[in-house]
Amino acid sequence: MNDHHLNHRIINNINASSSSSSSSSPVQTNININSANNTNNNNNNNNNNNNNNNNNNNNIDNKWKKNLYEKQPYSDNYTDETFLIGLVQNANFIKYDFWTVVLDSFTVSQQITSVILFAIIFFHSLKHTLTLPFLVAMAGGFLVLGYIAIIIIDPSANFLSIRSSFLHIILLFGTVYGLSPVLRTLTNSFSDDTIWALTFILLLAHLFFHDYGYTNNESQKFSAPVSLNAAIFASVLLGSRLPSNIHVFVLISYAIETFALFPIFRHHLKRHSMELHVGLTVILCVTCSLLLLGMSKLLALIYIGIIGTITFVCPLWLIFIQKYKNEINGPWDEASVISQSGGEF
């Protein structure tokens, strides 16, 4: 009886332990499954991070470079968004002021007026409306007054001594006087129409190639060989139409004073005083207008129209078209070599 009872207790304990183990095994299984899932997720995240790093490295390696010597995975006509990163527009842009441009245009008006005054002197010499002594006195007076005026308005200028200057003047005009007979007959065989046409072309060339920057004080050395030679040659052509050697000498003397010496005088005058520069322009234009009016009203009107256009219309036009200026600079430009003094070659 006791043995039967003991066996029954053992069987109950075994069943209890079996049921206990059966009830706890699903929990353990769930824990193991969750651990496995977490491990897989971590592995996937690591793989994604590695893929992102690889993509970033590939993007860095494949980034477009402005190199012609390196092969890149881009088409020949590909334009990257960083291509124009170094573009600079209108870096040297200078906004012009109307009255400043007008004052600078006076230099052109003065030169045109000087050419016309020279032609007027030739016309009066040809028609004998001005006497020869008056022409000689006027040429000598202009030379002396101009030399004295430069000394007064610009004492710092580097001039030769008075004695040396007069020696140079005597030598120059003495040479012209000695060559006057040759110059008078040099083109004597040319027809009048040829002389007028060649003179007109040469005087136009003189105006186009004149050194206007020197008169406007943009340079300190008068350099206009083509312009000066064209004007002197034009005076030689006109001299062949005059009646005497003295007339030729006076005309070429005027040419030297007008085309070689007068720009130097105007350069020093403007550097000394802008008011004197404006006053000289007004005097020249008024004198030329009155002289042309005595010859022909049409010529006077044409002259006034040309001077008015150059002085007022052209500056307005220049300022108007400034808004269309588009100067492009960038790293593709040629390198500028800078000298030790700071200027560019």
Curated annotation (Swiss-Prot):
Q: Which GO terms describe its biological process?
A: GPI anchor biosynthetic process
Where, per UniProt, does this protein localize? Endoplasmic reticulum membrane
Q: In which pathway does it act?
A: Glycolipid biosynthesis; glycosylphosphatidylinositol-anchor biosynthesis
- Primary location group: endoplasmic reticulum
* Catalysed reaction equations from the record: a 1,2-diacyl-sn-glycero-3-phospho-(1D-myo-inositol) + UDP-N-acetyl-alpha-D-glucosamine = a 6-(N-acetyl-alpha-D-glucosaminyl)-1-(1,2-diacyl-sn-glycero-3-phospho)-1D-myo-inositol + UDP + H(+)
As recorded in UniProt, its EC number(s) are 2.4.1.198
User: What residue spans carry the region label Disordered?
Assistant: 13-62
Protein name as it appears in the record: Putative phosphatidylinositol N-acetylglucosaminyltransferase subunit C
Task: Give the species this sequence originates from.
Answer: Dictyostelium discoideum
